[in-house]
C-alpha cells in the first residue's frame, strides 16, 4: 500500500540538492524579514529612541572600521545599506539558487520515474492487462507524474520556506514582546490545526474523485478504440449521456464536497486572522503606550504580524492543492508497487541484451503439464506431448479447450503448476527468459502493429536486419505483393494499430516480422481465422513455404489450413483427446472427424 513516504522517496535520488535548495529558499525568506526590522530601527533613529543593542554594537564596529563617528547619519547609512543588500543585491541571485534547483530536481525525477514507469509497464504480468483498462492505466500514470512534477517546486520552493518565514517572524516578535508572541503562536496553532482537519476530509473526497476520473477516462479510451462500433449502431447519443452522468457525478464531488469544504476553510481562516490582527494591534499599542516597546518596534511588530497572517492564505492554498493531488500521487505509487510478472525477472538487464543467444533444434516435450488461471478450474490437465525438431504440429479443439493457454505456457507467460516443459531436453523455467523468447516467434490472430512505417514494424524484433533480409522475409510471407499497392513501399506509415492496412495485410506483415528473427520455433495462433478466402490462401501458401525450416506450431479453427501438418493434436476440456495426421484422425470416430464434417458439410456427425 502506498504512503506519504513513497511520495518523499520519489525525489530521494537528489535529496542532497533538495536539502540545499530548500535551505536556500528558507534563508531568503528569513533575510527578507530584515527589511521591516531595519525600517523599524530607522524610525527609532528618527525619533531619537535607542537602537537594539546588537545593532548598536554592529554600527559602532563599522564606525571604528571606517573611522567615522557613531551618529544619526552613520546609523541611517548602515540601515539603508542593509535594506539595499536585502532587496537589490539579493534579487538576481534568488531565482538561480531556488527556482532553478527546485524545477531541476522535479524534472530530473520526472525523467527517472517515467523510465521506471515504462519498465513497470513492460514487466507487469499479462493478467494485469486483462483486468485493467489501458485508458485507466495511462490516466493514472499521466496524472501521477504530472502532479509530482508540479507539487515539488510548490512544496519545496514555497510551502516549506513560507512556514520557516512564519517561524522566523515568531522569533522576532518573541524577542520584542513575549505576550504578543504567545498570542501569535496560539492563533497559528489553531488555524493550522483546523486547516489540517479540513484537508483530511478533502483528501478522502479526492480519492473518490480520482477513481471516478479513472472510470471516465477508461470509458473515453474505449469509445476511441471502438468508435466504428459506436457509429455502426448509432449510439453516439447514449454514449454522450453516459459520459455526462459520469461527469455530473465528478462535479458533485468537486463542487459540493471538495470546493465547499475549502470555501468553509477560507471563511473561518479569514475571520480568525482578522480577529488576531486586531488583537495584536491593541496589545502592541498598549505595550508602546506603557513604554515596553519603542515606536520602531511597534511598527515592526505590526508589519511582521501582518506579513505572517498574509502568508496563511497562500500556505492554505498550497496545502489544499497538495491535498487535491495527494490521492492521485498515491495511486501512481500503487501502480509502481504492482508485482512484476514471474516471467519478467531480468528482462530489462543490460547484460541480457548483449549475452550470447540460445540456439535450439526445436524439440519440445511437455510432460504431465497441468495449469489453471485460478484454483476453481484446471484449463490444462496432464498434457503429455512430444514435438520433434522441424515438425509442423497443429492444435485444434473447441473454444476454451486450452490451445492458446498451452502456447502461453510455452512462451513462459505463465508457469505450469504441475509437470514440466522441455526444449532440447532443458526445462524452460531454468533458461533466461529474454534469450529464450528471442528464439521463438508468434503470429497472433490480431497482429499488433505500431504507428510507424512498414519497415519499422517488420524489423521490430530484429532492428539490425538488412534490407535484403527484410525483402526475403517479405517474399516468403508474400508481403512483397502488398508493397506494390502502398504509396511509399516499405516507408509507408501504417497508422495507429495499422488502420491503413487490411486484416490480411497485417497478417502477412506479422508473418514476415516473425520470419525475420529466424526463430527455432514459430507459432501461428489462429492466424487465418478472420480472413477472407484470398487472404487466407496467401497465408496458407506462406505457411507452406515455412514448413520444414523450423519447428512450427499452428492453432487453427479452420481445419483446411492444417491438412499438411505432420501431427494434429486435438484438445478437449483441457486434455489431449486425439493425436495423429489428418488422414489418420479422419479414420477415427472422434472429435476431429466430427469437427471436419461440420466444417465441410455443415452437418455434425454422431
Q: Language-model segments: which ranges?
A:
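Hydrophobic alpha-helical segments in the permease module
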Residues: 83-94, 188-192, 265-282, 295-317
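Transmembrane helices of ABC transporter permease
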Residues: 18-29, 89, 157-209, 282-293, ...
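Transmembrane helix-loop-helix hairpins at lipid-water interfaces of multipass membrane proteins
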Residues: 19-93, 174-179, 291-295
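Juxtamembrane helix-loop junctions of ABC transporter transmembrane domains
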Residues: 31-40, 44, 79, 84-134, ...
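An intracellular "coupling" helix at the cytosolic face of ABC transporter transmembrane type-1 domains
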Residues: 126, 143-152, 156, 164, ...
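Alpha-helical segments in transporter systems
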Residues: 16-41, 79, 83, 102, ...
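Cytosolic ends of transmembrane helices, especially the final helix of ABC transmembrane type-1 domains
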Residues: 231-235, 308-338
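ABC-type nucleotide-binding domain
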Residues: 352-606
Amino acid at each position: 500500500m502506498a504512503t506519504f513516504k513513497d511520495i518523499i522517496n520519489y525525489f530521494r535520488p537528489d535529496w542532497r540538492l533538495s536539502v540545499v535548495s530548500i535551505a536556500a529558499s528558507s534563508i531568503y525568506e528569513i533575510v527578507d524579514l530584515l527589511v521591516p526590522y531595519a525600517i523599524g530601527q530607522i524610525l527609532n533613529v528618527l525619533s531619537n529612541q535607542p537602537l537594539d543593542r546588537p545593532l548598536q554594537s554592529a554600527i559602532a564596529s563599522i564606525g571604528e572600521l571606517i573611522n567615522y563617528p557613531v551618529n544619526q547619519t552613520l546609523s541611517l547609512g548602515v540601515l539603508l545599506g542593509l535594506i539595499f543588500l536585502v532587496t537589490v543585491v539579493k534579487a538576481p541571485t534568488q531565482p538561480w539558487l531556488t527556482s532553478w534547483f527546485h524545477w531541476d530536481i522535479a524534472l530530473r525525477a520526472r525523467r527517472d520515474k517515467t523510465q521506471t514507469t515504462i519498465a513497470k509497464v513492460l514487466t507487469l504480468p499479462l493478467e494485469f492487462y486483462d483486468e485493467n483498462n489501458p485508458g485507466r492505466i495511462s490516466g493514472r500514470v499521466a496524472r501521477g507524474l504530472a502532479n509530482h512534477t508540479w507539487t515539488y517546486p510548490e512544496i519545496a520552493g514555497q510551502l516549506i520556506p513560507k512556514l520557516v518565514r512564519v517561524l522566523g517572524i515568531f522569533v522576532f516578535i518573541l524577542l520584542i514582546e513575549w505576550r504578543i508572541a504567545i498570542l501569535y503562536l496560539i492563533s497559528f496553532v489553531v488555524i493550522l490545526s483546523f486547516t489540517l482537519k479540513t484537508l483530511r476530509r478533502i483528501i478522502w473526497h479526492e480519492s473518490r474523485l480520482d477513481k471516478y476520473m479513472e472510470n471516465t477516462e477508461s470509458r473515453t479510451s474505449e469509445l476511441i478504440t471502438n468508435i466504428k462500433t459506436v457509429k455502426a449502431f448509432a449510439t453516439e447519443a447514449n454514449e454522450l449521456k453516459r459520459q455526462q452522468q459520469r461527469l455530473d457525478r465528478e462535479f458533485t464531488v468537486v463542487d459540493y464536497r471538495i470546493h465547499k469544504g475549502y470555501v468553509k476553510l477560507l471563511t473561518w481562516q479569514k475571520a480568525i486572522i482578522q480577529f488576531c490582527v486586531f488583537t495584536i494591534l491593541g496589545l502592541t499599542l498598549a505595550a508602546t503606550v506603557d513604554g515596553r516597546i519603542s515606536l520602531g518596534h511597534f511598527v515592526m511588530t505590526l508589519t511582521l504580524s501582518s506579513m505572517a497572517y498574509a502568508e496563511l492564505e497562500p500556505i492554505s492554498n498550497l496545502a489544499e492543492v497538495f491535498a487535491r493531488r495527494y490521492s492521485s500521487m498515491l495511486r501512481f505509487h500503487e501502480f509502481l508497487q504492482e508485482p512484476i510478472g514471474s516471467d519478467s525477472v531480468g528482462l530489462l538487464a543490460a547484460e541480457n541484451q548483449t549475452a550470447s543467444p540460445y540456439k535450439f533444434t526445436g524439440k519440445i516435450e511437455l510432460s504431465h503439464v497441468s495449469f489453471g488461471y485460478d484454483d476453481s478450474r484446471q484449463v490444462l490437465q496432464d498434457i503429455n506431448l512430444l514435438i520433434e525438431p522441424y515438425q509442423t504440429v497443429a492444435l485444434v479443439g473447441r473454444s476454451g479447450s486450452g490451445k492458446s493457454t498451452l502456447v502461453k505456457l510455452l512462451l513462459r507467460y505463465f508457469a505450469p503448476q504441475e509437470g514440466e516443459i522441455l526444449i532440447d531436453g532443458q526445462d524452460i523455467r531454468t533458461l533466461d527468459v529474454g534469450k529464450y523468447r528471442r528464439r521463438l516467434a508468434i503470429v497472433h490472430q490480431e497482429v499488433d502493429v505500431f504507428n510507424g512505417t512498414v519497415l519499422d514494424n517488420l524489423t521490430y524484433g530484429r532492428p539490425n536486419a538488412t534490407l535484403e533480409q527484410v525483402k526475403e522475409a517479405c517474399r516468403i510471407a508474400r508481403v512483397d505483393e502488398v508493397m506494390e499497392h502502398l504509396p511509399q513501399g516499405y516507408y509507408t506509415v501504417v497508422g495507429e494499430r495499422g488502420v491503413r492496412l487490411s486484416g490480411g495485410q497485417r497478417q502477412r506483415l506479422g508473418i514476415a516480422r516473425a520470419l525475420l528473427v529466424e526463430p527455432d520455433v514459430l507459432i501461428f495462433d489462429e492466424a487465418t481465422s478472420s480472413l477472407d478466402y484470398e487472404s487466407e490462401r496467401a497465408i496458407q501458401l506462406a505457411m507452406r513455404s515455412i514448413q520444414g525450416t523450423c519447428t512450427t506450431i499452428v492453432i487453427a479453427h479452420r481445419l483446411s489450413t492444417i491438412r499438411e501438418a505432420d501431427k494434429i493434436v486435438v484438445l478437449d476440456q483441457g486434455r489431449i483427446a486425439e493425436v495423429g495426421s489428418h488422414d489418420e484422425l479422419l479414420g477415427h470416430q472422434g472429435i476431429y472427424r466430427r469437427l471436419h464434417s461440420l466444417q465441410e458439410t455443415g452437418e455434425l456427425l454422431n
